[in-house]
């Protein structure tokens, strides 16, 4: 959005368009463990949020992990994050991380996905 001002201007700003909201994925069989989700949040903020966005809400240049089916698999996520499977695509390798770290991040992302999915569903019910 580009804003231009005039000293004698009387115009008001148009409403800000709503943020593009992806539909988070959920696996109902996945049980989020709150302690792991809390640890995962700390790890996500430290290692992931710079690219994948605060609260796991990506800005568009990288995958929004709340809507990624890859994150539903601990093995696939570990292969990308620890083993560097997507380095050629710009995803850095975090070889120092352990599978337990990835599991904690996975719990955080599932927790965020469920919270955001609930918000989106509640919003859909109030606007119809």
Model-derived segments and spans:
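Flexible coil segments in periplasmic/lumen-exposed cytochrome c-class electron-transfer proteins
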Residues: 14-46, 54, 89-128
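Gly/Gly-Pro-rich "capping" loops immediately C-terminal to redox-active cysteine motifs
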Residues: 41, 53-86, 90-93
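Short, cysteine/histidine-rich loop/knuckle motifs that typically chelate Zn2+
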Residues: 50
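Solvent-exposed, flexible loop/coil residues
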Residues: 2, 69, 95-98
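Active-site lining segments that contact anionic ligands and/or coordinate catalytic metals
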Residues: 2, 45-46, 60
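Blade-level signature of beta-propeller repeat domains, shared across WD40, Kelch, NHL, RCC1
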Residues: 1-21
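Residue-level detector of flexible, active-site-proximal loop/helix-junction positions
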Residues: 9, 72, 98
